[in-house]
Amino acid sequence: MAMSLLQDWCRSLDVDAHRALLVTGIPEGLEQADVEAVLQPTLLPLGTFRLRHMKALMNEKAQAALVEFVEDVNHAAIPREIPGKDGVWRVLWKDRAQDTRVLRQMRRLLLDDGPTQAAEAGTPGEAPTPPASETQAQDSGEVTGQAGSLLGAARNPRRGRRGRRNRTRRNRLTQKGKKRSRGGRPSAPARSEAEDSSDESLGIVIEEIDQGDLSGEEDQSALYATLQAAARELVRQWAPCNSEGEEDGPREFLALVTVTDKSKKEEAEKEPAGAESIRLNTKEDKNGVPDLVALLAVRDTPDEEPVDSDTSESDSQESGDQETEELDNPEFVAIVAYTDPSDPWAREEMLKIASVIESLGWSDEKDKRDPLRQVLSVMSKDTNGTRVKVEEAGREVDAVVLRKAGDDGDLRECISTLAQPDLPPQAKKAGRGLFGGWSEHREDEGGLLELVALLAAQDMAEVMKEEKENAWEGGKYKYPKGKLGEVLALLAARENMGSNEGSEEASDEQSEEESEDTESEASEPEDRASRKPRAKRARTAPRGLTPAGAPPTASGARKTRAGGRGRGRGVTPEKKAGSRGSAQDDAAGSRKKKGSAGAGAHARAGEAKGQAPTGSKAARGKKARRGRRLPPKCR
């Protein structure tokens, strides 16, 4: 965390990280002048410095200070601790040798290292896989073999070191969250803390490859020179931007490289048609299949000395100036896979490269079954990015940039933000893969939290879709699935019973306002037609207020149910029958007003059948419930 804080402050304050120190453990409340007084006896002999920034740390009851030297400082002479007030102050800095680690922090994106059957089987006659403790204690000669495996093993299957190197690498590269043992060159004590803090951010270590590590391997030595030529040409594409001092060009980038042996290409051109397609199961043109594919991570270091120069080119580089030497030796790491399908180790590396291509959003859906086609399809696309073609050691190299680190950031930050690749407009419409950026305007958006939210939303959508299909398998409603109609129908079915009672009561209240506008005509067919709605009304209404029997006919011949209607209310069927008889002879206002008081509710219930219920029967039922109005007098 302290090293990340140092890098963040240097970036925000435009301070050279190699000339800066981070001092932690400063007591709270100490002023800047007091801090400078404590630091001067220790740091002033190293060079002129100034205190640029101080801030209290959130998780600690202490402050941190950023110190900047005017000139380059000898990091070996910087003490780790400075005696100060209320304790010891710790000092951290970024060594130039640590910058190569940025190229080794890509395994989370580049490698999906898991045991394969071919790797577990190994080669007959080889020793078993050494444990993690033995991997750490290996001498420098064994370390050379481990580092060389990341550039791809030699194609000769008779070499016994090949399987051992791959298995050793698998022990070293484990997933984040598990205790891992680092192979390769042991880190110095000055680099151990930064090694832990930065490696945990991505969970992987990828050893950088130097020419000295490949001194005994002719094939890999030539491969190193070829990949270095590709990295050098890619770096030169941004040389004009960096020369202006604006540092607009990215310092680190990820590229896909194909290497083709010119002599083998000429032999392939002389072969009869169909021979290449039988040897290699792919639909690519026989002249378009390279000998190997590499995923290359390059870091431009214009301000730094090269870690290890190529011994074969050291004589020629000594005569050139320092800038040319640094430009001709960019730092890089690579994962190499040969295209020969008969090599199980090559297929393992090809699958890893294909997984990276897919995670970056460059692969097509139709090519996912064939890893080689999936990788080669990227080279045939118009990426609108930097692309170079060079020849080195009798090999043709074609390289295209897949991912850049923007805003003077490093590749680790670029990978962490999962920025979308620079695709042309027509390619952006196509699927860019799961890890492609889903922001149209900000290419660096789309972190891990957004990715988890997207995955959760997709899973929830699938679950809801499946549950909806199962729910509608035996449904009674014939509505289009997924439409608004099916939702409304489902809600209507659930609220059917409750809405009946509410609608009946509401219709009774409205009937009083419309009673003077309706007219009732007493007839036997109308009485029979309106009998069913009233019977239903009697079943659903409260027992204490609802009549129990059916109303009689106009002639008084109907029979009532046991118990009668309107018990204790002074309303009898005879009085109602007499009221209906007088309504046919007299058109007085009292007959219309009181005889049709409850006709509105049952008129709506019989509208669907084109019938209007009589007013006297509806009025009788309503009055029996309310119990307030007296029946009309018979004349």
Curated annotation (Swiss-Prot):
Residues 115-202, 260-332, 492-635 are annotated as: Disordered. Residues 541-557 have a biased composition (Low complexity). It holds the Pfam family PNMA_N. Residues 156-183, 531-540, 558-568, 619-635 have a biased composition (Basic residues). Residues 302-329, 502-524 have a biased composition (Acidic residues). Residues 133-147 have a biased composition (Polar residues). Residues 261-273 have a biased composition (Basic and acidic residues). Belongs to the PNMA family. This is Paraneoplastic antigen-like protein 8B. It comes from Homo sapiens (Human).
